[in-house]
């Protein structure tokens, strides 16, 4: 086992897959000589050169189209968004081309592309650079969506995403790049469609993902000290949702809390509630509690920015309100 920071875990995954398969390449703003805005591509340019580590202009729609075209020809591009919010400028390419071409071509085209980069609230990046786009992409047919939360799952998921023959949106959080974890020395992969049982429990199921996993686990320490026994599941796969794992937990605890950094209106939590109400409503002993970010642009001011997202005390209060 080796202790690794998250940005290094992502870099290792990329490096290993580029060594394994010459069709894998990465492109994006400052991914080459600079090594990426959060150093995920550090030293890869010197190792693989301009043809496989491409610095692009500030033209997201153009280089996304370039990557999709490369994928159609059999290459495996990794697109790094310097900030995931910038990918709104490539929304047409992601939706109408990456997401739909395999279907609209009758299966003649595969689009093995990974679109990854930093997002989420933190570092006082302002409203335009703090967007949570997972709900935007969730509505697009043909996409897979994952959100990493630890160095361990970041590496295993990214390696699986690169080898997948479908477009994968890969969310990383700006505040988790310096998170440390122990990684196996042997190669490993993690499934793109499975949730992770983080903590077994009986009283209530808490669903979460990305940065909020760590806020939930901070809350769990106090909850356990107060005699509560929550079950915690990291969704990881935001599309498709691992509804089977969610349902199995709900059948045991009969209470559900969703903790997300996504906006409440039309967010990931809203989709989970819809699916639970459609298929597993009879297993609920209490209304589902949803803790989400406020439906406002993220303020630049640090105190106001912090006030828009969920913190451990709110999670503790939510558990005590239904258990």
Swiss-Prot record:
Reactions it catalyzes: N(6)-[(R)-lipoyl]-L-lysyl-[protein] + pyruvate + H(+) = N(6)-[(R)-S(8)-acetyldihydrolipoyl]-L-lysyl-[protein] + CO2
UniProt: K(+) binding residues: 113, 161-162, 164, 166
Keyword Transmembrane helix: no
Disulphide-bonded residues: none
Name of this chain's protein: Pyruvate dehydrogenase E1 component subunit beta
Purpose: The pyruvate dehydrogenase complex catalyzes the overall conversion of pyruvate to acetyl-CoA and CO(2). It contains multiple copies of three enzymatic components: pyruvate dehydrogenase (E1), dihydrolipoamide acetyltransferase (E2) and lipoamide dehydrogenase (E3).
Pfam families given in the database record: Transket_pyr (PF02779), Transketolase_C (PF02780)
Complex and partners: Heterodimer of an alpha and a beta chain.
EC code(s) of this entry: 1.2.4.1
Binding of thiamine diphosphate, residues: 60
Entry-linked CDD domains: TPP_PYR_E1-PDHc-beta_like
This protein's UniProt keywords: Chloroplast, Metal-binding, Oxidoreductase, Plastid, Potassium, Pyruvate, Thiamine pyrophosphate
Cellular compartment(s): Plastid, Chloroplast
Gene3D superfamilies: 3.40.50.920, 3.40.50.970
One Gene Ontology molecular-function label: pyruvate dehydrogenase (acetyl-transferring) activity
Cofactor: thiamine diphosphate
Origin organism lineage: Eukaryota, Rhodophyta, Florideophyceae, Rhodymeniophycidae, Gracilariales
GO cellular component, one term: chloroplast
């Amino acid at each position: 086992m080796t202790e690794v920071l998250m940005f290094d875990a992502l870099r290792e995954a990329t490096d290993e897959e580029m060594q394994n398969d010459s069709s894998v390449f990465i492109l994006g703003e400052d991914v080459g000589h600079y090594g990426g805005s959060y150093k995920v591509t550090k030293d890869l340019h010197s190792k693989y050169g301009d043809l496989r580590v491409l610095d692009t202009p500030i033209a997201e729609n153009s280089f996304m189209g370039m990557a999709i075209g490369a994928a159609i020809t059999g290459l495996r591009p990794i697109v790094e968004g310097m900030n995931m919010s910038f990918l709104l400028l490539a929304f047409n390419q992601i939706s109408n081309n990456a997401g739909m071409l395999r279907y609209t071509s009758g299966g003649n085209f595969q689009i093995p592309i990974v679109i990854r980069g930093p997002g989420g609230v933190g570092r006082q990046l302002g409203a335009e650079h703090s967007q949570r786009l997972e709900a935007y992409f969730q509505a697009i047919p043909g996409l897979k969506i994952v959100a990493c939360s630890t160095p361990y799952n970041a590496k295993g998921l990214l390696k699986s995403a690169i080898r997948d023959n479908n477009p994968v949106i890969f969310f990383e959080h700006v505040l988790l790049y310096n998170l440390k974890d122990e990684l196996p020395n042997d190669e490993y992969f993690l499934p793109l469609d499975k949730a992770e049982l983080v903590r077994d429990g009986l009283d209530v199921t808490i669903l979460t993902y990305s940065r909020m996993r760590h806020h939930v686990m901070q809350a769990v320490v106090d909850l356990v000290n107060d005699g509560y026994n929550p079950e915690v599941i990291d969704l990881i796969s935001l599309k498709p949702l691992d509804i089977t794992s969610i349902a199995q937990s709900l059948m045991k605890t009969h209470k559900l809390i969703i903790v997300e950094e996504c906006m409440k209106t039309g967010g990931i939590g809203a989709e989970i509630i819809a699916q639970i109400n459609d298929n597993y409503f009879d297993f609920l002993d209490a209304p589902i509690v949803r803790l989400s970010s406020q439906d406002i642009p993220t303020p630049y001011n640090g105190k106001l920015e912090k006030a828009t997202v969920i913190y451990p005390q709110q999670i503790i209060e939510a558990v005590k309100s239904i258990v």
